[in-house]
Amino acid sequence: MPKKPAQSDSTEQSVSFESSLSELESIVTRLESGELPLEDALNEFERGVQLARQGQQKLQQAEQRVQILLNDSADDAALTPFTPDAE
């Protein structure tokens, strides 16, 4: 009998960037309130780190997709590498 993927794996993949960001903002608010017991705060922090990493990965994937689409464009315009700190 084939193994089913872990529930958390399939859940993580199906969660949208926006819902992850919303959950992360909620976690930050609860942590900043200072009212959580230590164990709960650590659990929330751990989940927040996980969400932040997932969000960063999704953003990187989106950036790569945009670069691929722009590189495949017919006008062959020169692209400047994306630098998030540039203004």
UniProtKB/Swiss-Prot annotation:
Its main location: cytoplasm. It catalyses: Exonucleolytic cleavage in either 5'- to 3'- or 3'- to 5'-direction to yield nucleoside 5'-phosphates. Keywords: Cytoplasm, Exonuclease, Hydrolase, Nuclease. One of its GO terms (molecular function) is exodeoxyribonuclease VII activity. It comes from the Bacteria. Its EC number is 3.1.11.6. GO terms for cellular component: cytosol; exodeoxyribonuclease VII complex. SUPFAM superfamilies: XseB-like. Transmembrane segments: none annotated. Belongs to the XseB family. Bidirectionally degrades single-stranded DNA into large acid-insoluble oligonucleotides, which are then degraded further into small acid-soluble oligonucleotides. Heterooligomer composed of large and small subunits. HAMAP family: Exonuc_7_S. NCBIfam families: PRK00977.1-1 (NF002137), PRK00977.1-4 (NF002140), xseB (TIGR01280). This is Exodeoxyribonuclease 7 small subunit.
